[in-house]
Amino acid sequence: MTVDVKYRTSATATGGRDGQASTADGSLSVKLSLPKELGGAGGPGNNPEQLFAAGYAACFIGAMKAVAPAQKLRVPADATVTATVGIGPRSEGGFGITADLKVSLPGLERTDAERLIQAAHQVCPYSNATRGNVDVGLSLA
């Protein structure tokens, strides 16, 4: 697979799940905390799963906007994507994540909305990165 990279960014983490992460350009700096469910203190910071969920949700809206014109559709201004990301042990060993995307497209006919969601899932960079590795559920709110 070849990718014609148009944009590149980097982030650095220190301290692992109880540390901090920031982008090289300084636009994002987050304190990280391990959730109680994973044996941590559940502090005030964020965790990688939350950051992944936020990124996937935002990216998926962008993917819908990218494919909508070819479908002769417009993504409503009040469209939302809620990404729910889970983490846990895999039966094969190690840990894995799951993702469920709940998409709200007010004003679109159900068949149009479902077609748009499927088309976006084929081009979304997060969907392409997870395909074959992460169980991703798609639903229309």
Specify the residue positions occupied by each region the protein language model found:
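Extended beta-strand/beta-hairpin segments
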Residues: 1-54, 61-141
